[in-house]
Amino acid sequence: MRKLVIILATALIAAVSAGAQTETALREGWKFAFGNAADPAKDFGCGTEYFNYLTKANSIHSEGPYSAKFNDSAWQDVTVPHDWATTLPYAPQASHSHGYKTVGWKYPETSVGWYRLKIDLSKADKSRHYALRFDGIFRSATVWFNGYYMGTEPSGYAVQTYDITPYINYSADNLLCVRADASLEEGWFYEGAGIYRSVWLVETGKVHPTQGGIYTEWTDGVLIVRAETANDSSEETEAKVAFRLLTKDGAEVAKGTDQVDLLPGETATAEAAFTIAKPHLWDISDPYLYTLETTICGDTYRTPVGIRTAEFNAAEGFRLNGRKVTLKGVNLHQDHAGVGAAIPDGLIEWRVKQLQKIGVNAIRCSHNPATPALLDICDRLGVVIIDENRLMGINAEHKRLLENMVRWGRQHPSVVLWSIGNEEWGLENDPRGALVARQMQDYVHLLDPTRQTTLANAGGGVMFREADVKGYNYIRQNDVENRHAQHPEWIAYGSEETTGCGTRGVYFPEPGRMPSINRTGTPENVIERGWQYYRDNPWTGGVFFWTGIDYRGEPNPLSYPSHDSEFGILDYCGFPKDEAFYLKAAWTREPVLHILPHWNLSGHEGEAVQVWVYSNCDEVQLSANGKNLGRKKMPEGGHLSWEAKYKPGKLVATGYIKGKKVLTETIQTTGPAVKAVASTETVGDITIVN
């Protein structure tokens, strides 16, 4: 039976109030239209006016979309997050890596998108500070507010914040206008197009913490709390900053104060130190979060705090709170069936929970900085994160983007490692690459001295020597065993390893589909080989499989009209493939028994079929159409196999632990579907129907 995931928006406007700070999600009321990347006349004349937005500070001389007098009545109504690429057709000439969607430099007419939003600020307090925060726009985003040019962010993955306080209309509508240009790709995977992450209206006091400016550091029983404080008032200010650490129940654990003297426009950092004898530690099994109350000039801001230690070393791999933890991880791109890159927060949480069900405790954000929502969710759910930089380099632009990632991630206990790059083939064997890596690593340590850095290596032997922690992309590419023998002091983990997955439910070759490599591939390129290696070598930190969930783009080894990668452990809708049960058996204590393939093999009657079982039972017995095929001992981290001639009917597997029957799994040949059965699950602001 086919299953369908339907995502329904149930809340389009949300406000998150944190004491004096209010963050309002700007979700509904947006207008959208395509511009044009090659023809200014079809791009609403943007930038071609006699006085354009770069020559004069306001668009009063323009009739373009950033002008209040512009008529957008013919534009589409959309909600944000929004990925316009999902609505575009496919074409064989389009980008293979981006899933053959007609977006990119070949398609100027569908690669620029314009957004307009009217915001009512008639009740805004003139004594307060207001900013707009965009968690991510793909890409090359230009922002105007009430006709004033706010700025341009070329990266599709950077959080961008603009002070709008001086430009507010308190007696009329306020116009927010955004132009996004997705002509160029930043990655080699589907990236979407448009305002694909959340947009926030942020209200604070005039003297306030900077965005991402409240952060903590736990070292040797002492919690250092810091608040980078900005003075956006017109007066010199003696800013009194008070900190209180509270339990989940609101009990005060510690408190302290500091003062920073700030001239108008100046920024300084207040801090305090709390000695905490027996903190409740944040852990993957108990993701406990304190609350830090920071009061600045009478305004209070609340920040989640997770206290924990995390380190990688050469002897034990990864240690969390002083004990060895094996990272059971997956790589993850940010896109999903139906919504593309514009994943609502509730769906992000649902995806993480589906992965946790099979034992996943770690996610590598491949290959770009995570959306802030994912970090918040993993803080709450107890999943550790490797946050990854998009583009290696050491000039001002590269460092700005690197700092953006670190500032937004350093307060999250889920983040345990900063990745400065991935498979940089042009640098991996070049001494210049080593210099770049060293300078990037030093800069990260300056911004965050509490975490190590990593580099995901495709096989080169020069650049990745500089990384604190060596990330091996595939055992077969990196000669891991010999490198460990030569350099036992190196700290290492599997940053990528193959899942060997294919199209869910496909077991024989057919056009546009990919049977699992695990049943047809070489022993060096299957999921069992990857897990067994990292399980049996405790000096490694664990492994991150490629990938946790199918994603659009990179349909290798297939090509058009196939458009998504099928190496995910879960398919594009989040349904588990056979390999999900293999990992669940290996990674959890819950008894697992799973038979493959399915038993609807029309056209293969009378053929010998290899029937596999994934399980963590001690022994499994299999019968086919009532015939006992035998009872076998289950190899740890492996599979069992029986040969059965296909005949419509029934397969029954029985699992035994310590000689006692604990599980029975039955699959059988089915006829045509007679009805559709749907169930719903609501997570946050979305409902999933399957």
Task: Give a label for each model feature.
Residues N169-S171, R226-N313, W642-P648, I657, ...:
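Extended acidic/polar, glycine-enriched regions
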Residues S171, D220, L263-T267, G606, ...:
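Solvent-exposed, conformationally flexible loop/turn segments
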